[in-house]
Amino acid sequence: MKCTEVFNRNLKAIVQRKRLIINQGGARSSKTYSILQLIVLIAQKAKGNRIISVVSETFPHLKKGAMRDFIQILEEDNLYSDAMHNKTDNVFLIKSLCGKFTSKVEFFSADSSSKVRGPQRDYLFINECNNIDYETYYQLL
């Protein structure tokens, strides 16, 4: 896995147990791709079953952006499998390197407050958070 400085800064923040990490930068600056690489690493190194949510303003935005990048990362690392991808629910399962645990990476849109209310998770990545209203953001946390 080829990693960028954005990846390294986010990894450092995760290791330091930062509760909130904000990435700012221009288009195509590797923010989304680097964070998705980090999500794969978190799932692989997990010492328990983890739930990781990847959220964006609309599902088409998510599908053409973060989800496409996530599949590409999994394929490049020979981790993608149809058996581990629930295309109906937009969920990917990733086995930990020790083989004992399986993390769930779920993709969903935040275009309805009913979709974001209540679910518990270990990690949350809001892609293009500036396009999400504050109430929805608050519900996601």
What does each model-found stretch correspond to?
Residues 1-141:
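Phosphate/NTP-binding elements of NTP-utilizing enzymes
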